[in-house]
Amino acid sequence: MKKDIHPNYVECTVACACGNTFKTRSNKPEIKVDVCSKCHPFFTGSEKIVDSAGRVEKFNKKYGRK
């Protein structure tokens, strides 16, 4: 294998929009996510609706659907 061509593999802090944080390893020092295992409906068992309206509106705007 060639030396000095791979990115640095460091400890990473993952921050969720709900406020939960946890550590893992990655080539980035910080990652921000919208949902995690503490707030995702599959893991919590609640019927929380994950906001996807923004993505749908963006798609419709981009491709001209009304």
Swiss-Prot record:
Coiled coil: none annotated. Binds 1 zinc ion per subunit. One of its GO terms (biological process) is translation. Signal peptide: none annotated. It comes from the Bacteria. One of its GO terms (cellular component) is ribosome. InterPro entries: Ribosomal_bL28/bL31-like_sf, Ribosomal_bL31, Ribosomal_bL31_A, Ribosomal_bL31_sf. Its cofactor is Zn(2+). Zn(2+) binds at residues 16, 18, 36, 39. Keywords: Metal-binding, Ribonucleoprotein, Ribosomal protein, RNA-binding, rRNA-binding, Zinc. One of its GO terms (molecular function) is structural constituent of ribosome. Belongs to the bacterial ribosomal protein bL31 family. Type A subfamily. Part of the 50S ribosomal subunit. Binds the 23S rRNA. This is Large ribosomal subunit protein bL31. It comes from Campylobacter hominis (strain ATCC BAA-381 / DSM 21671 / CCUG 45161 / LMG 19568 / NCTC 13146 / CH001A). The gene is rpmE.
